[in-house]
């Protein structure tokens, strides 16, 4: 998936799932399942319930995404 093919949206973590998966509520009200990107995992970025995050979605499956940024 090329970077320009993905859709980036803002959301809030509402639930933590096993294996570094999270349930994220997007700004438009949709709920998606997202995992942490490799660079965030490598740098040990901790994500907790209630954090504001940026999620990349692929146009092929809008129910799954990748967390690429955690807002402070």
UniProtKB/Swiss-Prot annotation:
Keywords: Cytoplasm, Initiation factor, Protein biosynthesis, RNA-binding, rRNA-binding. Residues 1-72 form the S1-like domain. SUPFAM superfamilies: Nucleic acid-binding proteins. It is found in: Cytoplasm. One of its GO terms (molecular function) is ribosome binding. The keyword Cytoplasm applies. SMART domains: S1. Gene3D superfamilies: Nucleic acid-binding proteins. GO terms for cellular component: cytosol. Its main location: cytoplasm. Component of the 30S ribosomal translation pre-initiation complex which assembles on the 30S ribosome in the order IF-2 and IF-3, IF-1 and N-formylmethionyl-tRNA(fMet); mRNA recruitment can occur at any time during PIC assembly. Belongs to the IF-1 family. One of the essential components for the initiation of protein synthesis. Stabilizes the binding of IF-2 and IF-3 on the 30S subunit to which N-formylmethionyl-tRNA(fMet) subsequently binds. Helps modulate mRNA selection, yielding the 30S pre-initiation complex (PIC). Upon addition of the 50S ribosomal subunit IF-1, IF-2 and IF-3 are released leaving the mature 70S translation initiation complex. This is Translation initiation factor IF-1. The gene is infA.
């Amino acid at each position: 998936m090329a970077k320009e093919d993905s859709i980036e949206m803002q959301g809030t973590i509402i639930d933590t799932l096993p294996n570094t998966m999270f349930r994220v509520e997007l700004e438009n009200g949709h709920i998606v399942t997202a995992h942490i990107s490799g660079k965030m995992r490598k740098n040990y970025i901790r994500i907790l319930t209630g954090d504001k995050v940026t999620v990349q979605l692929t146009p092929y499956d809008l129910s799954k995404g990748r967390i690429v940024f955690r807002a402070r």
